[in-house]
Amino acid sequence: MLLPLFFFFLHLHLHLSSSSSISFPDFQIIDVLQPPLTVTATLPDFNNTHFSDESSSKYTLRLLHRDRFPSVTYRNHHHRLHARMRRDTDRVSAILRRISGKVIPSSDSRYEVNDFGSDIVSGMDQGSGEYFVRIGVGSPPRDQYMVIDSGSDMVWVQCQPCKLCYKQSDPVFDPAKSGSYTGVSCGSSVCDRIENSGCHSGGCRYEVMYGDGSYTKGTLALETLTFAKTVVRNVAMGCGHRNRGMFIGAAGLLGIGGGSMSFVGQLSGQTGGAFGYCLVSRGTDSTGSLVFGREALPVGASWVPLVRNPRAPSFYYVGLKGLGVGGVRIPLPDGVFDLTETGDGGVVMDTGTAVTRLPTAAYVAFRDGFKSQTANLPRASGVSIFDTCYDLSGFVSVRVPTVSFYFTEGPVLTLPARNFLMPVDDSGTYCFAFAASPTGLSIIGNIQQEGIQVSFDGANGFVGFGPNVC
């Protein structure tokens, strides 16, 4: 499929305090007539592209965008966009339900509630997985595609015997053929990490309910995961025998949320809770990366304190204080991004949400600030969730104002142009890639994170941006 690709001259600009002498570009240039890029829907050779450094405690995996799967086909760019925005709307709704505690119950009554532990609820919604990794499960390792989810505290794969399974790209994992599979017993310390854990024939059972009512249910186990030559033993993993509502060929999910049962939490002894990622830009044939270990924390990054929400400990909240357009800070209502004592509002960084959502008052002011500085550009009708679009079909290049996030304690992140003005069809229509949130919660989505080195220092409670682009 042919997708428009535009070029930007100025990539990423960060400084450590608002009083820094470092100046910011007020405008960037978009080359509207950059030749379209053909995206080949084939899978890369992960035998060569997921790797680790055996001389360190650094584990690295390649990230693959869902559009690279051969099973994903779209008639055109317009169809691709609308499918992505439908997933995105579902994802946002699921996160809001998760934080509010309103999760749609499973309709499958063949597993009794008292057979399982309490729900480990993920922010991931049906069909919203955007990025995948390739991981070897068991001994010998069977390679599986797994969705990464920064809002989930669970690692799981579909398992035989499969009472109810969705279609996946690889054969369903069979624990009977793994020499390292060990079931977790009731009353064990691992099972106790799931509140009110349930038992079945002496084994620990789990149930993960997602925001739309999809789920995975099965047995909790300890298993070996392999990344190329790196072997990680005794990972607490769900072996799902009943799974409904998953998507696009993934075998399961690699949760990298803030809880102790996530992959990040389980590796904290070796990695200090440190990890980072570079999300591949949409519409390219390249792969991103997911790195675990202290070496994922680069020198020269700009660090922002993480904010903990006891009501939603899986999610990574950050302190956001303001927004800028063209070097001008936009006036916003006081406290519009604050996390309240009751756990409402705040700003979440999420890998599964595509488009950044802002509270309505902040979004309107931000959007209007951008519109006022792009009044010379011809407008187009809104597309999907976007209400601010431009007809750039008659242009060779366009000068646009920069967009910036002002974080707590001073750091400023100025986005590359492709992260805030995106093509939505094959006819030169570009849209301002932000949307209003239905509540006071803000979500920084993966479109705004693309191509930026993002690092999490869980031990010290910081998230870093840069210094590199990727």
Swiss-Prot record:
SS bond partners: C159-C162, C165-C239, C186-C204, C191-C199, C278-C470, C389-C431
Assigned EC number: 3.4.23.-
Protein name, entry field: Protein ASPARTIC PROTEASE IN GUARD CELL 2
Residues at the catalytic site: D149, D350
Domain of life: Eukaryota
Function according to Swiss-Prot or TrEMBL: Aspartic protease that may be involved in drought avoidance through abscisic acid signaling.
Secretion signal span: 1-19
GO molecular function: aspartic-type endopeptidase activity; DNA binding
Phenotype seen when the gene is deleted: No effect on stomatal closure.
